[in-house]
């Protein structure tokens, strides 16, 4: 199902994608196969450790421990967002992305 969703998106091999909340890495696995670079911001420390262990030998991924709402979005290059985000912070995340100095080219929320 995830590969179908990504396949229907406008994400391609030259893209830089930010994934908000990598969780167990199911979406991440698909993104690293397609994208030039993937940034995963994970708030839960145990899931962060899991992602670091799972993707330790992958060169096109950067896993960041922290709160996406405090994460500084890129200012000088284009990027896309692909994420499955919690309902209770959806409005705050969309507001941050919409009003960013350099908003994302595309936003995919599942």
Language-model features: locations:
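Catalytic cores of RNA-modifying enzymes
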Residues: 1-110
């Amino acid at each position: 199902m995830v590969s179908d969703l990504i396949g229907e998106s406008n994400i391609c091999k030259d893209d830089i994608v930010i994934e908000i909340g990598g969780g167990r890495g199911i979406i991440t696995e698909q993104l690293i196969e397609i994208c030039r670079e993937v940034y995963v911001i994970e708030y839960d420390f145990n899931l962060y450790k899991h992602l670091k262990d799972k993707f330790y030998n992958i060169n096109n991924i950067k896993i960041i421990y922290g709160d996406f709402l405090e994460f500084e979005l890129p200012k000088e290059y284009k990027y896309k967002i692909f994420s499955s985000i919690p309902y209770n912070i959806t409005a705050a995340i969309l507001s941050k992305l919409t009003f960013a100095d350099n908003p994302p080219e595309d936003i995919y929320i599942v």
